[in-house]
């Protein structure tokens, strides 16, 4: 990997050149949980890649040619093909590159992973609402909603009787939902999983994974980024560099 800790490109910057042969490029942002999904899969599969960080508070004009919505992650290969939307980029990488397969071949097992992904889909917007809350009075209601969503995921693990959501070994679904759980400590929301022992064991197991530990972001850095981002600071995306 190259460029993971490089400063982000913003408005007025020159677009990067063609992607070198043998590499795939990911347009990312160091603190973005959606881009982290893609980076986790790249790392887990050992895919040689180049990271170009984008300043999401001051986006380059040329970036909208990579993704009309102006969001990360975006993949670009040496043929100039572009793939965006985090879950789609992850599935593409698993299908297009050799090595460890993260999605099961069995249609039912693959469908089960997609159902868990849908089941977890309320967690990201709840955490975003929590980060953007205007007063502490909103906290208790949001925490209760999170507890309910985590209870649903706890039930999945209870029924499967496995450590991971896809079975006895780590797979795609675990990487897709992990970035949001990594942020619980920074947001002081660990209390929301006090009633979910299997979910806590899953989190402990995830922390031991090489790809997860390689991309771990310290809670204090996440908090500092969140503070700057909420202030609309153009320096938010480059915090700590």
Swiss-Prot record:
The keyword Transit peptide does not apply. Residues 106-225 form the GST C-terminal domain. It is found in: Cytoplasm, Cytosol. Its EC number is 2.5.1.18, 1.8.5.1, 1.20.4.2. GO terms for biological process: cellular response to arsenic-containing substance; glutathione metabolic process; L-ascorbic acid metabolic process; xenobiotic catabolic process. Gene3D superfamilies: 1.20.1050.10, Glutaredoxin. The modification N6-acetyllysine is found at residues 57, 143, 148, 152. Keywords: Acetylation, Cytoplasm, Oxidoreductase, Transferase. Transmembrane segments: none annotated. Belongs to the GST superfamily. Omega family. Exhibits glutathione-dependent thiol transferase and dehydroascorbate reductase activities. Has S-(phenacyl)glutathione reductase activity. Also has glutathione S-transferase activity. Participates in the biotransformation of inorganic arsenic and reduces monomethylarsonic acid (MMA) and dimethylarsonic acid. It catalyses: RX + glutathione = an S-substituted glutathione + a halide anion + H(+); L-dehydroascorbate + 2 glutathione = glutathione disulfide + L-ascorbate; methylarsonate + 2 glutathione + H(+) = methylarsonous acid + glutathione disulfide + H2O. InterPro entries: Glutathione-S-Trfase_C-like, Glutathione-S-Trfase_C_sf, Glutathione_S-Trfase, Glutathione_S-Trfase_N, GST_C, GST_omega, GST_Omega/HSP26, Thioredoxin-like_sf. Glutathione binds at residues 59, 72, 85-86. The modification N-acetylserine is found at residue 2. It holds the Pfam family GST_N_2. One of its GO terms (cellular component) is cytosol. Residues 22-101 form the GST N-terminal domain. GO terms for molecular function: glutathione dehydrogenase (ascorbate) activity; glutathione transferase activity; methylarsonate reductase activity; oxidoreductase activity. Homodimer. This is Glutathione S-transferase omega-1. Most abundant in the liver and skeletal muscle; also expressed in heart, diaphragm, colon, thymus, kidney, lung, ovaries, spleen, intestine and pancreas.
């Amino acid at each position: 990997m190259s460029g993971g800790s490089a400063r982000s490109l913003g408005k007025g910057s020159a677009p990067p050149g063609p992607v070198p042969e043998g590499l795939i490029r990911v347009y990312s942002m160091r603190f973005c949980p959606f881009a982290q999904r893609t980076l986790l899969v790249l790392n887990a599969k050992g895919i040689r890649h180049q990271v170009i960080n984008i300043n999401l508070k001051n986006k380059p004009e040329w970036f909208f040619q990579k993704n009309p919505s102006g969001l990360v992650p975006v993949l670009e290969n040496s043929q100039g093909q572009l793939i965006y939307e985090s879950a789609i980029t992850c599935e593409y990488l698993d299908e297009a590159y050799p090595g460890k397969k993260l999605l099961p071949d069995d249609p039912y097992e693959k469908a089960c992973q997609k159902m868990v992904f849908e089941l977890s889909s309320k967690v990201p917007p709840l955490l975003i609402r929590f980060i953007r809350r205007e007063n502490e009075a909103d906290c208790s209601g949001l925490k209760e909603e999170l507890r309910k969503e985590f209870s649903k995921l706890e039930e999945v693990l209870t029924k499967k009787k496995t450590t991971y959501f896809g079975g006895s070994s780590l797979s795609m679904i675990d990487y897709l939902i992990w970035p949001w759980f990594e942020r619980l400590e920074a947001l002081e929301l660990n209390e929301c999983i006090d009633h979910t022992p299997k979910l806590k064991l899953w989190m402990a197991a995830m922390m031991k994974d090489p790809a997860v530990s390689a991309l771990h972001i310290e809670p204090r850095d996440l908090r500092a980024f969140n503070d700057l981002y909420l202030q609309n600071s153009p320096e938010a995306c480059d915090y700590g560099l």
